[in-house]
Amino acid sequence: MEAGPSTASPGVSVSPAPALTAGEVQLLKVPQKRFYRQRAHANVFIDHELDYPKRPELMDWSTHYPAYFSQPNEDGTITQGEKKVEWADVGCGFGGLLMALAPLFPEKLMLGMEIRTSVTKYVTDRIAATRQAQSLLPADSVDTKPGGYQNVSVIKANSMKHMPNFFAKGQLEKIFFLFPDPHFKNRKHKARIITPALLAEYAYVLRPGGILYTVTDVKDLHEWMAHHLHAHPLFEYIPTETLSDDPILEAARTATEEGQKVERNKGDKWVACFRRKEDPKEEDED
């Protein structure tokens, strides 16, 4: 178990966006969550209005990462560049993890996947506002963040159905499942984000050596997720103490809005991280 609060600044402005001058504030409207209210969870089994590619190479990333991807060609075809999305925050909520990690790892393209419409809109606006704030700063400003948040985006998606539509085999380096819906009732367990069937898909898009992070404040859910990950042949447990100095794990524990709420309530956080194993070698035929 990983427990104990960490310091975090809740704030109402975009965090960790830089402080702006009074003139810049007039130019920039920072989104506020109270205008993006929606239910805490969504039914993943109903058909939502979702756009997703038939296969990863057909995904147009130019609207998400305009600094890294060119727009589709005149004939509608897409030219894939060398950069790929490598980190995915599944059920990213209001984007706290993404905004914390983006300036720490400006060379990594990271994507939040969120099924709720209003929450996705909030994160989209939050990223746009933060990018604009960065563009208003002088190049030599101490508040300028590496990458200017051009490496982060969000998409409305049902990760339980469409992960392989967005990501090729072995494309992802890190996948985060932070404070997911616990689905307490037994009949609802099939809707949990970690199941044997779903782990097969996560193992497909996660490269060997990649890490899957889980954090929750619900002990039963922690034990459920850890049990299924331990049982899967393509994942191996990483002792949490070996990641004690990992800024990514610290952000996973403390940067999300849910994580900060748990800290304010002095609750426990349960952490389990697993590494993707190498694919088993095929035995030579006699």
UniProtKB/Swiss-Prot annotation:
Protein name (record): tRNA (guanine-N(7)-)-methyltransferase
Active site positions, chain numbering: 181
Primary residence: nucleus
InterPro entries per UniProt: SAM-dependent_MTases_sf, Trm8_euk, tRNA_(Gua-N-7)_MeTrfase_Trmb
GO MF annotations in UniProt: tRNA (guanine(46)-N7)-methyltransferase activity; tRNA binding
EC number: 2.1.1.33
PROSITE patterns: SAM_MT_TRMB
Source superkingdom: Eukaryota
Quaternary context: Forms a complex with TRM82.
SUPFAM superfamilies: S-adenosyl-L-methionine-dependent methyltransferases
UniProt-annotated binding residues for S-adenosyl-L-methionine: 91, 114-115, 158-159, 178, 256-258
Organism: Cryptococcus neoformans var. neoformans serotype D (strain B-3501A)
Taxonomy of the source species: Eukaryota, Fungi, Dikarya, Basidiomycota, Agaricomycotina
